């Protein structure tokens, strides 16, 4: 998530400054299969790994053999003397360590250069600059046994400066011209050359429907309890839709599109359609699912809390402090940014960014009580106390503000339910069951 956030924030900054941004997404051919064992041992030694651990890893790769199963039978065993183990939980760490050692002399400060496993992104302000850096990376990696994929590597040009002349040069790996694209799927999130998120919104909805169809045997089965269907949806389908939404500069039209898709899923789970004229709130209460828009707010605030608690010199904090260039703002309304969306979320819920600091909450009891007015934790002790409290209070009509309450586990900066600024004990407790 951090890499996606960095890339979107950099694109927002360049768009505000009206400066062109050039990106190349590099893919390594059979990255795990091309790692020389000698380079692996040297990288471990250079990083100061203990000798005992190095010997343990060497034992894992010593005298490794495999066979190939075909229609004609199984082949004889043959040794494997190169590459990392496929499927091993240790392999991604070893590969990252090797790549870091091989490129430590040419790496630049993020976000100018971003590495995530075998996915490499290089950023530049011109094609010529990008070509120079790409050639440097090619020499550094291909001289050690790796190979940059000519077919899967792609180039994207973000033309935020409409008055700048287009360069005639091409972005190349050696003699091969890298194809230019208008959007690229980076770590599961669709990045567009105009900095917008429409492509990613549509992709998330499609991914959610694909997951929903795979589970339709359960979700559409009339014999399965409706509450179990809701729990299955919250566990398997909704996280697929919400992936990457923390980094969206979301607009109301995007929220509407995602909300409509979710309601279609929930209605089909209940065996209902819009022609049955059942309100959305009744469907949600029956299934036990809160509006996905509120979950998007929760995820944004949770991620905002993680970012704010990071050290000031971390890359996710430095990208927000990039110096603005002195440019003349163009005509029209400025484009919405992630920070503007977060600021609006905080203002609508009377929250302060200082609440993200753990030490502030520990020292300021008033701030802690205020924040707890917006966050519901699903602790066993609190659940028991709330049940006792409900039994002692006269049952009232359902409150629309309580419909967003949920019982999922939350981290500190989660906003699972956004309620008015009312003390906890003075809130009206409804008889309707909590749903999330």
Regions found by a protein language model. Name each.
Residues 2, 6, 98, 133:
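Charged catalytic carboxylate motif
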Residues 1-93:
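Conserved pre-catalytic core of RNA-dependent polymerases
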